[in-house]
Amino acid sequence: FSAAFLTQLVRFHWKAFPLLQVWGQAGAGKTQTVEPFSHMHYHLKMPKKISAAGNTFFPMVAAVTQSASLPVIFEELKPRQMAKFQLDQVQNLLRTNYNGERLERGSVNRDVAGGGTVVNGYDNVAPIMFIGEALESQSAILERCVSTPLSKEDRDGRSDEFEYCYARRQGGPISWLGRSMIDAALAIKPDLVRDSVAKYRDLFKSKVSRRVYEDQNRPWH
């Protein structure tokens, strides 16, 4: 969520931005964990979440093309409960978001006598985060994701801290932090983002094995 403020700068340099996948068993607190962080991008309004299984495709396309830095959150990504055509559309949306590819849809032109078809283009550039109960199985999507597993055991002993943050999620300290990040993102120089990433890649290289470092198909932003 903090990196989303720099989405456009990251895409400018590397033509890519990874997706975030939060997955785990029912009751692990996936949505309740995501919501406070999403308030870095919202102040008094509640963050918008879209059900991947309960919506038609066009509202999802509209969401990922309306902003280049506001995270879009897809809930209820349950492949077993989705029709094949619907699942193919959602997976294509996720897969093409990594490189910010353009989506195109055909429609009938009602402004011209006799009709006719037109092709509308949409830039799939908003940072995407999706929530599900199982790890995404399609390798083309998985290799473009930062995967974050959660379980019920992760919540043990942390309820007081979580309740403190959750109760103050709307218009509170998390929103103020987000405003500070917006100001910093607007003031940052594009070259600083590039140089900082290069610096931390070198640090990462010195800390891990060669095999891990050379797995460049995994997102590292």
Model-based region annotation:
Residues F1-G54:
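P-loop NTPase catalytic core of nucleic-acid-dependent motor ATPases
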Residues P59-V112:
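Conserved nucleotide-sensing/catalytic segment adjacent to the nucleotide-binding pocket
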Residues F17-Q21, P71, P127:
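Residue-level preference for the first positions of well-ordered beta-strands
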